Amino acid sequence: MNFRCSSPLWYDDHLSDCVVNHYLSTLIPLTACLASAIACLISYFHARQNAKHIDTGFHPVASSEDEAVDQIAHVSQQYITAIPPVIEKLEVALILAEISIAIFLLIFSGENTDLTSVFASAVSSIYLLLILFVRLTRSLQSYVDLQPHSSVLYTLQWTCLTAIVHAAILGNSERNFTIATLVRFALFTFLCLFHWTAPRIPVEPYDEDHVLFLDPSEDETASLLSRMTFSWLDKLVWKAYRATLQVSDLYQLNHNHRSGVVAPRFKNTATNSLLWRLFGFFKSDLLWQGAWATLNSFAVFVPPVLMRSLLEYLEVPDLASQSTAWLYVTGLLVAGIVAGVAGCQCDWKGREMAARTRAVLINEIYTKVLRKGVALHLQTNSEQPEAADNFASDGNIFNLLTVDTEHVSEMSGYLYLVWITFPVQTAIGTYLLYRLLGISGIVGVALMLGLLPLNILISRRLVAVQARVLTASDARIQASSEILNNVRTIKYSAWEAVFKKRVLSKRRIELVEMRSRFIWWSINMTTFFSLPLIVTILTLFFYTVVWDNSMGTAVAFPALVIFSILRIPFNRIADAITFLLRAHVSLGRIEKFLQEQETGKYEQLSRTDSVEVGFNNATLTWPNGGFGNKAVTENKRSDIQLTELPSMRPFKLKGLNIRFQPGALNVICGPSGSGKSSLLLALLGEMALVNGQVFLPHKHNWHELSTDSLTETTAYCPQEAWILNRTIRANIVFDLPFDGRRYEAVLEAVALRPDIASFDQGDQTLAGEGGSRLSGGQKQRVSLARALYSRSKYVLLDDCLSAVDSKTANHIFFHAVKGDLMQGRTCMFATNSIQLTIPHCDYIVLLDDGRVRGQGTAEELVSEGRIDADIMQNKAEFGSEKPGAYDTIELDHAIKSPSSRSSLDTVSLLEVDPQQEDPEAGYEESKAEGAVAWSVIRTYLVTLGPPWYWVLVLFMFGIQQFISLATNIWIKEWAVRYDMLDNFAFDPIQRNATTRDETLDEPEEPQKVQARYYMAIYVAICLAYAFFTFARDLIVFYGSLKASSEIYERLLNSVLFAKLLFFDRIPLGQITNRFSRDVEVLDQNISTFSINTLQIAASLVMIIVFISSVVPAFLIAAVFICVAYWFVMTIFINGARDLRRIESVERSPVYQQFSEALSGCVSIRAYARASIFTAQNQVLVDRLNSPYLLQWASQQWLGFRVNFLGSLILFFTGAFVVWDLESVDPSSAALVLTYAAMFSESIMWFVQLYAIVQQNLNSVERVVEYTEIEQEANQPLKRAVYDLPEDWPSRGGVRFDAYTTRYAPELPPVLNDITFNVPPGKRVAVVGRTGAGKSTLTLALIRGLEAELGRIEIDGIDISEVTLDRLRQAVTVVPQDPGVFRGTLRDNLDPLHLYSNEEMIETLRAVRLLDAVRTYIPGNSATPLDCLDHPANALSRGQRQLLCIARTLLRRSRVLVFDEATASIDHTTDAAIQESLRASVTVGTTVITVAHRLLTIADYDKVVVLDAGCVAEQGSVQELLDRDDDGIFRRLCVQSGDLEKIERVAAEKSGRK
């Protein structure tokens, strides 16, 4: 059969019979059926091949990684959907009717009927019936989903029949054929409606084992039409419009997007390269996205083609009938809708890929983190310029999750721009421009291509400047984070002004870089808006001046529209290439991390048959790694202490030959930095094994473990407790089945009952980020409780008694470490509490500098002289405590909030009152609802500038829009001139009428048109447009920088001088978020998005006004359409804002859990919880992807409706022009059609940008909120009756006089009627049980709490009459938690740079830290003061505490206050510090020490015993010891085990007196 048509394709306002019969009725339907059959066969054989490898079993968490791939990778194939059965039965009837019609035409057709086309329709209908029959039998449902085939074929048939019906009605077809065609059209209309509107339902219900998946998501069950128009989101959008969305309102995530499905599938990909693995994994999605992008690329160019035809009709109406003109107008509407649907589907497919890419990459990174080796990062010296590059730091790994995965996932949604949209649209646009402008059109496209490098260059320059901004921002955030991390140290020392100056200096650098960024952003935006004008100038120059062509209306404005369409891919390709390069770099960083060396734990501990625990001639070391030549890791909390380093070379444990006693208590002791923590980690297999062997029976597969008996796993309690941001109970139970009896026994053993009873939510209280809502002692006890509750056979404890008082330590040791819960377990206990532990342990290992100095039983080591025999003499004094003897709660360092109880109410630890508030309610980060308050917006606007500034801004926006309109009006005038001349030349009647009626001179000949004149004016207008655009942006950015600087300084001031209670109540992460993300939005996003929003808003107003002025009737339609726009935008804004906020909220748990895994990977591996944490991470990622995808679905929901309304704008504009043909001249019609064509894109950008501005204003609201927090009263609360002496305090006497205070007005007093004296130059100890109020007393001394009653005097001066700065300079407090800053030792010892090298070195020597830090001196440096860029990463906790004490001694304050400052220091060093304090007292320093180690204060001059916030006892040590057995101090001494030593020291002191 010959398919070539000799007649015209279009004849007499309809398609020719040749096209209808040969193509629409025959070739297209048969080809589609053949393609469908081939696709079905390919899918069938492919599915059969895959089915051979499917494991039909399924478990939510597989027992191994490989098994998880087999079990989950193909679950989606069991999820086949179908049209409801009722509709399928109707389908059968309709297709049988279609076949009957074909038979009827074959029998009764006339001579003019093409039988081939009728036969083709019969064959295609039979194929449709065959597909339907297979669908009904469900015989192939596991292999091929045939429902989409039916939908596509019905739609294709309906589309062809639409044109056939049009031709049959307007042509001379036979009556039977016309009727049959109309009936067929009706049948396929019903079929299409059935398939387009029918919801999809699961063929089979979910299996009970498929517990990973919940109900189908809305988009899975939505109809085809609903998916094309995103109507499946209607319920959610309406719900968001009526009320604020909550997480519970969100739809289920599509199971094909779940991490538990996509991650195992991705792991099954075979290629080595991560990039090609991603391409292979998403190949089908990329092809679908490419298909939609291709359809969109063709559809967007249909309007300018139709516009040209319409304008030609307007110029010469006789060229076509009016019905053809209306066909053009209808085509504008249809093309706009098709382009909108294709564009939305293309973007949606990209976002689906982005979500799955994020899930895949986060899973890859997360599982790698759980397998990564532990690396130690040291400062590299000048002799070693290149840092080892073997390991990523924690900060870099976190950046992989937060930054790099986002770069890659976002780029995956835009790949179509590079490989489809840009090349296809460029080719189509070039062809159309060539048809319009000839060679000049090609020149125009060539110019756009030639200017593309300029776009890329500016984009790269902007990226480079942005990188500098990020670097400066990182420095500023790091400085502010350092303040927040050490805020107590800074406030205690009155260093706010100094550290504020440091931050502001970083801020000034950041503002300078931001100024550069804004300048380049202005250049970029000016270029963005000016390049189309430049291309237009040069194209028209060649077209009119060089080649002297006539540029009429029908040529100029379609060309402008085409250039406008091409501008989008040309501008987006520049950004896409930049983002693609950035994503490629990020992908490389991720791949590099994934290729890092993993932990050797499983190889070292691979001997599963061994029952020994210990080392055999083992030498172990820490790998020394860096990442990106970064020398020092970020200051992140870790569950391990990689800090015991005697030299710049990695620390080593050398020649270990140890056999720990099974089922016994093994104690590891030694001085600070000797390697105790490292030995425990080496036992876990976390250190690199140089030679020898490590023995520790270990199973690392969670599903092989029993939950009701001891298992071959290890419970690990690091020195700095690893606490999850879960409830206290969840931290203890740690994903094991809950056993109430065992749980109660654990709480009893670790003395947590009273603490839990003090919380309103009991054990359902959230521990906070890193345990931020718990005190140090509470965190250690929760960590120990986790170990006891576990079924682990081996327990490793790292100094877990250092943060509790002696009574509590005594209770924990005998009830937990030596209690029933430890029976049958092997315990390795690294500790400094040798007096308590050694007399009762079974085996001892003495360490010094990484070597075993001695090992054996206590008796053996005493006989060898390695242990003091006095320690063993106190053995009988321990264990006298009765069960349940502890009776206090630890509140000194816990969160002081209205939710804390004042007394030990009788509360069930296992049940919480359901009417009580959510435990998170008091600590959740504020999340504003609805629109941002006007007061916040007004605050920001006022800081931008005075009234004259706003007048100037409005003027610049107005003049810029006026000039923009002038460019097109001038083109119109230019084109009109050509139109007039053309009409004059070819229409003598028109020429005579014009001359006679209008008395005008005869127009010039075409060659006499002053093209250069029009070109010159156009160039001038364009230059003015570029200038005012650039100037406007600079003016706005000037105000933005001013506002950013002012608001940030107010934020910094407000937080720095906030009350200490603010930092107790608000988690550090929330405060840091204000200084990082919110400030970034304030600095960079508000102004840029606001400019674009205001510009587009002004442009939209200008377009509507202009079109209405040319076509007044359009105003009627415009009113209704604008109302529809407003309605759609209003209901969209609420949902988009809520989804964005929910996504921000759900992002935090992902980052938090990742941080917890990063810092606790050692504990996770020890407890064999890797698979559990991976599953939890996948759930959190799904919770993040759900609002993310819904947010982008709402964007597409909006996009389709905006495009539809935009198409209506273009349709009505064209309709009114055709309808009012006589009153609208072609040039004006061309201009209004041009603006109408651009309206849809503009309104879409406006709504999206407006939503972004609303979301960004939320950050402004959050920042402004923190500028209004309650401040400390820096000025004196009372007016002094005399001037403060210059040398105050000269003596250092302290007096508490009936002092009473409380944390908040609604809480009971924490100190009540405190009265005692501290004589000048004396040393006074404050002791008491945990929770007695000791630490609160230190806060009172520096007015961290203000007096409610009574007073505190220093040298007779009421401290309320002294400014805070002066007071805190006079009184130096050393807190229990060591505060160490970034910078060298010099910067840490002397932040104000007031002391000499000699003074600092002497102070280091006094606290016994000098020898330790000398080993870190790089090269041949003579002083240790300039080494260690970040001491927190190189010093152990005890050494960091020594550094803080050295800083305190260096200040030489008259009053020194130590708040349990030596709790983490070994006894020998503690004794040395006490000797230093004695030396200080000789020069008149008053020392107040809060202590748990009573032996260290035995020679103090006075002891004050606190109990329940009151002074229970006071006097000299000897006086308190002489009291009867009911004396609190004496009982504390007995419980400490040092009573005899304390009595001896006290007697010697009293004897000296």
Swiss-Prot record:
The keyword Transport applies. Pathway: Mycotoxin biosynthesis. Disruption phenotype: Impairs the production of cyclochlorotine. It holds the Pfam family ABC_tran. It is found in: Membrane. ATP binds at residues 670-677, 1328-1335. Glycans are attached at residues 176, 524, 617, 725, 992, 1085. GO terms for cellular component: fungal-type vacuole membrane. Belongs to the ABC transporter superfamily. ABC-type transporter; part of the gene cluster that mediates the biosynthesis of the mycotoxin cyclochlorotine, a hepatotoxic and carcinogenic cyclic chlorinated pentapeptide. CctS is essential for the biosynthesis of cyclochlorotine, maybe as a chloride channel that supplies chloride for chlorination by cctP2. This is ABC-type transporter cctS. The gene is cctS.
